[in-house]
From Swiss-Prot:
Record-given protein name: Selenocysteine lyase
Cofactor list: pyridoxal 5'-phosphate
Species per Swiss-Prot/TrEMBL record: Xenopus laevis (African clawed frog)
UniProt keyword Zinc present: no
Complex formation: Homodimer.
GO cellular component, one term: cytosol
Keywords associated with the record: Cytoplasm, Lyase, Pyridoxal phosphate, Transferase
Main function: Catalyzes the decomposition of L-selenocysteine to L-alanine and elemental selenium.
Location of the protein in the cell: Cytoplasm, Cytosol
Length: 426
């Protein structure tokens, strides 16, 4: 009789087990079908009146409505973009340009001369952090990077409010961190900023707008722009089983929340984002959003159960040889994210993964894959000790990850650790 565990491993020999869903997700079957259908039947220009063009416009309108429903907004507040990077850049540069334009209208000498000031956290994705650094470098804006708490792993509301200046025009805080999974208190922050902005208005000071990059949260936890109270929210399709395009929610587009185009050309997307629309990818994004609207609660329950099972198995097998880096007291985290370090033997996270037979995962954010063997800055800033940060591996489960997958992966990580231990001794 064949040993059950051995049979499971044999069944996995021909495929790898993917646990890097925070980096990207495979397109859902329904999304692939929608994209293929649009390529065949809706290839026309959406601005034209013939059948293929009308079909394209219909698909785009449907997708816009579906994406708005997913985040609790209105269809007219959704702008399609090439991805999260473009959406984030649009918000940041719009805030700067809007401050400069409206400063001429304000009658307050305290801010007339000042550069616009933007507040963010020190653990943001590069698509927020690097544009802000560029604005700072070119003397177009003042930037404050508020440190996250090394206890909770999140940016604290009082620290953000303390950083506000008379010339502050925007706060940009991610909704959930891609490496630790920590969920930031954006809703609480928005309430404080709204109260503060009312006082500032009476003083002739600029309103403080609020942006959140929701790339990691969508499809894992419920996201509602009304509850969050944000002006802007970034949407990234490939993080929730959609295609690699994005969208930007802008509450009260053009009047309540200013937005300025970064590109100029044909009058698409309300003149905010020119260029003929990418109908198949937009339709696919809409389909992915519809799946989230229908099933997000079930996705969250499943991923949390599998993630918790993964951490229990890791603790049972490794004991004090590992450190779970994404457990922060007093902070919520994404239901799918486990950041773990192998402490004994002391190895690099990259080395641990390279000795695994089945596991496909990463040591952190894909945008930092060029940093070599240096520890993750996000983990260090979140209070993870340097030795643990150097050996960290990010394991992020998905909608279809099973307990059988976890069982095999934990054994895979264990045999990899044993091999590394023997190599260290020899």
């Amino acid at each position: 009789m064949v040993d059950t565990e051995s049979q499971k491993e044999k069944n996995h020999l021909n495929h790898k087990i993917y646990l890097d869903y925070n980096a990207t997700t495979p397109p859902a079957r329904e999304v692939v079908g929608t994209v293929a259908e649009a390529l065949q039947e809706a290839w026309g220009n959406p601005s034209s009146s013939y059948t293929a063009g009308c079909k394209a416009k219909e698909l785009i309108d449907t997708a816009r409505a579906r994406i708005a429903k997913m985040v609790g907004g209105k269809p007219e507040d959704i702008i399609f973009t090439s991805g999260g990077t473009e959406a984030n850049n649009m918000v940041l540069f719009s805030a700067v340009e809007n401050f400069n334009r409206t400063s001429k209208e304000r009658q307050n000498n305290n801010v007339d001369w000042a550069l616009p000031h933007i507040i963010t956290s020190n653990v943001e994705h590069d698509s927020v952090a690097l544009p802000l650094l560029q604005l700072q470098k070119t003397h177009k804006a003042e930037i404050t990077f508020v440190p996250v708490s090394t206890v909770t792993g999140r940016v604290e509301v009082e620290d953000v409010i303390s950083a506000v200046r008379p010339n502050t025009c925007l706060v940009s805080i991610m909704l959930a961190n891609n490496e630790t999974g920590v969920i930031m208190p954006v809703g609480e922050l928005s309430q404080c900023l709204a109260s503060l902005s009312r006082k500032r208005s009476a003083q002739g000071l600029p309103e403080i707008l609020l942006h959140t990059d929701a790339a990691q949260a969508l499809g894992k936890v419920e996201v509602d722009v009304q509850e969050l109270g944000v002006n802007y929210l970034t949407i990234v399709g490939h993080k929730f089983y959609g295609p690699r395009i994005g969208a930007l929610y802008v509450g009260g587009l053009g009047h309540q929340s200013p937005l300025l185009p970064m590109l100029y050309g044909g009058g698409r997307e309300g003149n905010f984002r020119p260029g003929t629309e990418n109908t198949p990818m937009i339709a696919g994004l809409g389909q992915a959003a519809e799946l989230v609207s229908l099933h997000c609660a079930a996705y969250e329950v499943h991923m949390r159960r599998i993630r918790d099972y993964l951490e229990q198995k890791l603790e049972a097998v490794f004991g004090d040889r590992i450190r779970l880096n994404s457990r922060f007291p007093g902070a919520e985290r994404l239901p799918n994210t486990c950041n773990v370090s192998l402490l004994k033997p002391a190895v690099l996270g990259r080395e641990w993964l390279s000795h695994c037979q089945y596991l496909q995962a990463s040591v952190g954010a894909a945008c930092h894959s060029d940093r070599g063997d240096s520890p993750s800055p996000v983990l260090l800033k979140s209070g993870v000790p340097q030795d643990a940060a150097r050996s960290a591996v990010r394991l992020s489960v998905g909608r279809e990850t099973s307990q059988d997958d976890v069982d095999l992966i934990v054994r895979d990580l264990e045999q990899a650790a044993q091999l590394l231990g023997m190599n260290k001794q020899s």
